[in-house]
Amino acid sequence: MTSKAVVFAYHDIGCTGIEALLNAGYEIAAVFTHADDPRENTFYASVARLCAERGIALHAPEDVNHPLWLERIRQLRPDFLFSFYYRRLLGAELLACAARGAYNLHGSLLPRYRGRAPANWVLVNGETQTGVTLHRMVERADAGPILAQQAVAIDPEDTALSLHGKLRKAAGALLRDSLPLLALGVLPEVEQDESQASHFGRRTAADGLLDWHRPARQLYDLVRAVTQPYPGAFCQVGEQKLIVWSAEVVAGNHGREPGSVLSCDPLRIACGEDSLVLRFGQRGERGLYLAGTQLATELGLVEGARLRGPASGPQRRTRVLILGVNGFIGNHLSERLLRDGRYEVHGMDIGSDAIERLKADPHFHFVEGDIGIHSEWLEYHVKKCDVILPLVAIATPIEYTRNPLRVFELDFEENLRIVRYCVKYGKRVVFPSTSEVYGMCQDPDFDEDRSNLVVGPINKQRWIYSVSKQLLDRVIWAYGQQGLRFTLFRPFNWMGPRLDRLESARIGSSRAITQLILHLVEGTPIRLVDGGAQKRCFTDVDDGIEALARIIDNRDGRCDGQIVNIGNPDNEASIRQLGEELLRQFEAHPLRAQFPPFAGFREVESRSFYGDGYQDVAHRKPSIENARRLLDWQPAIELRETIGKTLDFFLHEALREREAQA
């Protein structure tokens, strides 16, 4: 019986995959591809042309995961989906359309070099082997079980173009051997070894900058990784750009400074280790392709001259405005940015106890104040700074029912004013959305771009925080369509030192773990709301802040206009389990003897704890594919470690409180 396939394909290997399917006897019901980008050098074969010649139905939608396209694909009733160098991620609903599974051909030996541009990256990194992999598609990019692989040797003289040719041949051979077995259902699958996984993002022309302080071998690898048809490696000669198309490594650098011209015939440049002969290149984007010797003459180079790589002079630090700088995220983020050395942090908050350790840093500027009052200071600093983070918010569940109007006024109205200042002055805003916006969504994993945002009835006032944040997300998105640069990030239950204060927990206005620790410290029963069965995914603040710092860094602008969940799906636990692990570590803590005996667990109804208008959520687990793809980020800290350092912080705080009262 003929197997029916729907194919997602682009590039040479897209054509190779389509030809292989036809040769293996598959029926191709439709092909989805991309319209060629006029800004891109399309040196590869055309999937559109091939399909036209073969009489195959072809589509190029902007969003293949759109419900309209999902329904059309379902109506085709495919046995298989195949992706051959298609450039967009296929969502879970789309993958489920295939009765016998969805499969991707990836241009590396997975699990190494997941992600974008693997053929370029293996050359940049000096690898001697790569290959192609046929694997089952899962929601995580390039992470599904492997069905077949074929290795490809990388020769010292290979360029990205020659290596791509080798990969194309390997792909053809692998598919020729594998597709018939797949149709018969006899091709075994092997899970990927996550400990060996590596992930690489897309490359841009700016990544071709030559840093002469690096070893010549590394620069040679960069040149061959980005030479024609790619934009090329480059450096500066005075005010002129020199693009290098071909080079070779020569031993020694005569002890000269990196970037020094050692000779003009051949054109040889000293590197941090050894030297590089520039064989061919061109002046600027529109120059002629010339030999290195002629380039030296036309550029006016002489022995001893210096070529420039990355700017070596002092650069202005990026100014980051953090409103709510004394809060949990604000103080940890400030510390991380100041440690980086590339940022100047300006902050405002109504207190400063959590940032006292930062005040001595000359690049940290703090003003004590209220964003609702100090509007002139606020507008001036939005205008002055480069990146704006409005972190001021009421984010404790009991306040959602106790002070709903205050939640709306601060979390929506005051922050909307800040967003409008960003629009007015053309500033980038990194806005803290929340995992609460997903509400009672029933998806197993909450996806930023696909999950529905579901909240309860109007009389359940606990949702005022969720909808205030969601509405502001939508306003920011709408401003983004008019040119506002933004990123929305959604923290999932971040924990760590300085999360709250025990004093806040005493009045009920704190996060769950702080409330639990307060009960241990004071010897009162740990209250489990509705039995504590609710599950959350807890994220260590150090993991979360690292992701947020990468959003602020925004390499290649990849975070612009994006929504990013920041959470740890592997750290899922119920509130009861959280309490039990806290108790275990509390009993083993060196300070245990300083506190009263454990008073037990007590189950309470949510209404008695939070008051009328509360409604809870059974689970809240993030999809972190956007964070992996955009930030090359993966949370690493286990829950028990996070609980341990959070507990330790609050136990020491409790003793300090006791000493102060003595």
Curated annotation (Swiss-Prot):
NAD(+) binds at D349, D370, I371. Residues 1-307 are annotated as: Formyltransferase ArnAFT. It catalyses: UDP-alpha-D-glucuronate + NAD(+) = UDP-beta-L-threo-pentopyranos-4-ulose + CO2 + NADH; UDP-4-amino-4-deoxy-beta-L-arabinose + (6R)-10-formyltetrahydrofolate = UDP-4-deoxy-4-formamido-beta-L-arabinose + (6S)-5,6,7,8-tetrahydrofolate + H(+). UDP-alpha-D-glucuronate binds at residues 395, 400, 434-435, 462, 493, 527-536, 614. (6R)-10-formyltetrahydrofolate binds at R116, V138, E139, R140, A141, D142. One of its GO terms (cellular component) is membrane. Pathway: Nucleotide-sugar biosynthesis; UDP-4-deoxy-4-formamido-beta-L-arabinose biosynthesis; UDP-4-deoxy-4-formamido-beta-L-arabinose from UDP-alpha-D-glucuronate: step 1/3; Nucleotide-sugar biosynthesis; UDP-4-deoxy-4-formamido-beta-L-arabinose biosynthesis; UDP-4-deoxy-4-formamido-beta-L-arabinose from UDP-alpha-D-glucuronate: step 3/3; Bacterial outer membrane biogenesis; lipopolysaccharide biosynthesis. The active site is at H106 (proton donor), E436 (proton acceptor), R620 (proton donor). The record marks N104 as: Transition state stabilizer. Gene3D superfamilies: 3.40.50.12230, NAD(P)-binding Rossmann-like Domain (3.40.50.720). Its EC number is 2.1.2.13, 1.1.1.305. Residues 316-662 are annotated as: Dehydrogenase ArnADH. InterPro entries: Arna-like_SDR_e (IPR045869), Bifun_polymyxin_resist_ArnA (IPR021168), Epimerase_deHydtase (IPR001509), Formyl_trans_C (IPR005793), Formyl_transf_N (IPR002376), Formyl_transf_N_sf (IPR036477), Formyl_transferase-like_C_sf (IPR011034), Lipid_A_modif_metabolic_enz (IPR050177). GO terms for biological process: lipid A biosynthetic process; lipopolysaccharide biosynthetic process; response to antibiotic. The keyword Lipid metabolism applies. SUPFAM superfamilies: FMT C-terminal domain-like, Formyltransferase, NAD(P)-binding Rossmann-fold domains. GO terms for molecular function: carboxy-lyase activity; UDP-4-amino-4-deoxy-L-arabinose formyltransferase activity; UDP-glucuronate dehydrogenase activity. Homohexamer, formed by a dimer of trimers. In the N-terminal section; belongs to the Fmt family. UDP-L-Ara4N formyltransferase subfamily. This is Bifunctional polymyxin resistance protein ArnA. The lineage of its organism: Bacteria, Pseudomonadati, Pseudomonadota, Gammaproteobacteria, Pseudomonadales.
